[in-house]
């Protein structure tokens, strides 16, 4: 994990239960080391853990999402935020317009609105949080309206056209230092279901409980969160094409890339689009390696 990640040392379940007593019912023993953990294949357990973390570490008093919506793991999400800050810090000052605060566009914020919440709490960034799902936007608005700082810094916008990403969201007079995105990885519902089942099987290896092995879709996630025609390669490809129209309004476009094999094709697309800077930033959470691709139409010189 990033050196600034608050969760580098694992979870302090005593403190987490104190922050949110509802977590206690989900704590179990890991069968290999007998340490406290939760069943990460149980979305209710992950939801309770998230609320505990948000309360204890980020001072967010209210956070709730409907059943069936993606419940993100906070340590990995905040890692993306810290690496984005590193990206900005490494950017020549001549490319950083004298505009404060830092403005960020989150594509596909989801009902959890997790990236804007973490970005506001860690760096006081300002966000536009967009999504194609009206329920996600409604829930996200409800969450941020309960906190003055979040409400001041985060603006939720519905994307009315599911075939568009930046179009219809970025206004003519707006400038963003960053765009961020956790794209739909899979190309079909069947592929998404297989991926979820595989994750559940792997997670259950470390727990006594195996009762969740048949809950194939219980990780949560609506269609737009999990899959789209062509999967992440097609989605990011569309993002690259649209980004050209906003090359003067965005300093860094970024997007998570699940499959490393996609990087070569994405880099080629970016070169054809005349991107001036292309970066791939690796992130590690335990044995898991994730990454995001970043591009800019601003020349480093």
Curated annotation (Swiss-Prot):
Enzyme class: transferase
GO annotation terms (biological process): rRNA base methylation
Bilayer-crossing regions: none
Entry keyword set: Cytoplasm, Methyltransferase, rRNA processing, S-adenosyl-L-methionine, Transferase
Compartments in which it is found: Cytoplasm
Coiled coil: none
Catalytically driven reaction(s): adenosine(1618) in 23S rRNA + S-adenosyl-L-methionine = N(6)-methyladenosine(1618) in 23S rRNA + S-adenosyl-L-homocysteine + H(+)
InterPro entries per the UniProt record, alphabetical: METTL16/RlmF, rRNA_lsu_MeTfrase_F, SAM-dependent_MTases_sf
Gene Ontology CC: one annotated term: cytoplasm
Cross-referenced Pfam families: Methyltransf_10
Primary localization class, coarse: cytoplasm
Superkingdom of the organism of origin: Bacteria
CDD domains, A to Z: AdoMet_MTases
EC number(s) reported in the record: 2.1.1.181
Record GO terms (molecular function): 23S rRNA (adenine(1618)-N(6))-methyltransferase activity
Annotated PANTHER family: RNA N6-ADENOSINE-METHYLTRANSFERASE METTL16, SAM-DEPENDENT METHYLTRANSFERASE
Function in brief: Specifically methylates the adenine in position 1618 of 23S rRNA.
UniProt record similarity statement: Belongs to the methyltransferase superfamily. METTL16/RlmF family.
Name used for this protein in its record: Ribosomal RNA large subunit methyltransferase F
Organism the protein comes from: Colwellia psychrerythraea (strain 34H / ATCC BAA-681) (Vibrio psychroerythus)
Source lineage: Bacteria, Pseudomonadati, Pseudomonadota, Gammaproteobacteria, Alteromonadales
Primary gene name: rlmF
